[in-house]
Amino acid sequence: MSEAFSDFEVIPAVDVQDSEVVQLVGGERGTETRYGDPIDAAKGWVDRGASTLHLVDLDGAFEGERVNADAFESIIETASVDLQIGGGIRTVDDAVELLELGVDRVILGTAAVETPEIVADIPDQQPGSVMVSLDAKGGEVVVPGWTEGTGLDPAEAATPYEALGAGANP
């Protein structure tokens, strides 16, 4: 590994839609390529040496609630690596439930943009257990599921979250 990337970690993503691993083109619904079972995909990444997995409930991102919880709970129960989950986490209860199940980091997007205080409202956070994801398209933050522009500049929008307790690393 080169000196420049000595602290660099590749984190594979397992994006789930309709209970299957998918890849969307440009975050657009209807453009997906399907890759099969999320549990098998997660296991495959772990078997290849991944130390962290990035799990995304794409249905949750689009619909505003956790949809693929069963698949993710199976991954949480069996994966022996750090897990970060996003997509459809809109309430403190959603975040707390995932952290209590053993997720290392919850990722808040739409909920954090619409109600920044949610970051501070998640009780008993461990350092780094809450991450804010600001998705941008066309130079502005977009929510939910990358469908609506907010008019917010991504760099300016990011400013308050660290003070509220969000962070990528413990």
Residue ranges and their predicted role:
Residues 78-106:
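Catalytic cores of alpha/beta
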Residues 46-49, 96-100, 162:
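Non-catalytic positions within long, well-ordered alpha-helices that form the structural scaffold/packing
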